[in-house]
Curated annotation (Swiss-Prot):
Pfam families: Ibs_toxin. Keywords: Toxin-antitoxin system. InterPro entries: Toxin_Ibs. It comes from Escherichia coli (strain K12). It comes from the Bacteria. This is Small toxic protein IbsE.
Amino acid sequence: MMKLVIILVVLLLLSFPTY
């Protein structure tokens, strides 16, 4: 459960530019 949430958060962070 937690792993899925962490993966989703990481994907969102990677998709959005972190300038």
